[in-house]
Amino acid sequence: MVPEPRPGGALLWPAAILRRTNVMDHRHPVSGLRYPVSGIRYPVSGIVKIAARLWTRLIHPMTPSRFDALTSQFARLRVGVIGDFSLDRYFDIDPAKAETSLETGLPVHNVTRVRCSPGAAGNIVQNLGALGAGTLWPIGFCGEDGEGFELLKALRAVPGVSLDNFLRTPDRRTFTYTKPLVHQPSKAPVELSRLDIKNWLPTPSDVEEELGIALRNLGPELDALIVMDQAGVPDAGVVTPAILRHVRDLTLAHPRLFVVADSRHGLGRFPPLIFKMNAAEFAVLNGGRADAALPELKAGAERLATASKRPVFITLAERGIVGAAPGVPAVHVPALPVRGGIDIVGAGDSVTAALTLALAAGAQIEEAMVLAQAAASIVIHQLGTTGAAHVPELRARLFP
């Protein structure tokens, strides 16, 4: 739970927080520290700094030396990312330049800038690169179209990327999110209705076979693999049943390989891997509720980790993240305090990237979750873009 913004540059602790607070001694319900009744309202800058320091000292176990030891390993790590790569294309619109179409009488939105970046699995690659991963192998496809050209250009700009295993094929369209954003002075960008380009027919078997061969050949080279399923049309993306069989075979051939799976459409069809999901996705998989209380979520994560013999992570937005490993009690790491306006697009990808690098670097699950929460906290404050976090930013966020 984080303070709520109020007009005039102040924050109030939400009513739910105050109801759980001992009114007699005025203790904060998370930190246990006292604060005066008259001091419940604080200036924004002060409360954010106080909350961040309390989170650092009382909630997470990371020390600066441990942080440095883990993140210094990122540069040696070799990570593959197989899944649905999209082009995120932003149309920046200036409403002051609005016109009316002479032909239709409809409003005309004049675009003053076009920005392109890798999306979906590509955004995970971008986050891995920003965190300093040594070598990155995207494994997926794009079409022989303009969007594919822009996607390849954006991927090439990510440090450490090798595109030797990325296919460009005339049999597929490039998965594209086009996001019109209206910009006004002193206001957060407003996104208009999105325009998507997807493939609606099954992925050709020869494309699947090429991707499977790439995965098999890369296996011995990898420290970690991320499987990202986002296409939304059954069997029309990269993560088809055939590709999941290749992933399963890879885990059997390389049992020490960290393989993290993230799917917008449910992990129930996946082989046993390290699962990362949000609360709604976990509810579908586990038969529970997305708004379940923490004890219920922790118990469910423990059961799933025991059954799969792999760690499980559940992201909970403003409630933080829950993680469990086989035979180890589940752990909850709260979210960091919010600092002004936020944009949650891309936060899940930053969590996936940070969790994967941390685990491959030797982190315990709680340490990995701390790094992931710091990454998400940075990304959500990057407005109008999917965003990415860098190691120095993580350090500054965790140790203010």
Which residues fall in each region the model found?
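Arg/Gly-rich low-complexity intrinsically disordered repeat tracts
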Residues: 6, 27-46, 53
